[in-house]
Regions:
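Polytopic transmembrane helical bundles with strong interfacial aromatic enrichment
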Residues: 1-154
């Protein structure tokens, strides 16, 4: 039952995270408004929660060996590709995370959406978000290949 629960939570987090990062990017491409800012903040929060759940369940599944022994993953090039995509996603998230925290503080202090949401950085964060979504899809492709036995010698 643990194996099923972890796998389900892992995939739910993946789906929520993918939808949230796309929604964040879409909201940040809109003209500055209270609604766009609220949607961007909400999507960003879901993206963060989903990422913690996704990474947490993934590590648990890996280290506990609930699917395959950890050694299977360590020698599989598709696992290495997956981890590479994850590291890129995390690296791309640093600047947007810091910027969105700053914007949240400014909004909480009563700043007008036009003053809080700087259009240039918002467009860049939107682009980063869409690149991150693509990297998530590439992670899924690598995971499917790995789960089907590709990357290991028979």
């Amino acid at each position: 039952m643990l194996r099923l629960t972890l796998a389900a939570l892992h995939l739910i987090a993946l789906g929520l995270g993918l939808g949230a990062v796309l929604a964040r990017g879409t909201a940040l491409r809109e003209p500055p408004s209270a609604g766009a800012l609220r949607r961007a903040f909400r999507a960003d929060a879901v993206w963060g929660i989903a990422a913690v759940l996704w990474i947490g369940t993934g590590l648990w599944r890996l280290l506990a060996g609930t699917e395959k022994a950890p050694g299977y993953y360590y020698v599989n090039p598709y696992f290495h590709a997956k981890m590479g995509f994850l590291l890129l996603i995390l690296a791309l998230e640093v600047w947007p995370m810091v910027t969105l925290i700053r914007w949240r503080r400014a909004a909480a202090a009563g700043g007008a959406p036009e003053a809080v949401l700087d259009a240039g950085p918002a467009r860049r964060i939107a682009t980063f978000s869409h690149v991150q979504a693509l990297l998530v899809v590439l992670m899924v492709c690598a995971a499917v290949a790995m789960a089907r036995g590709y990357g290991v010698r028979s």
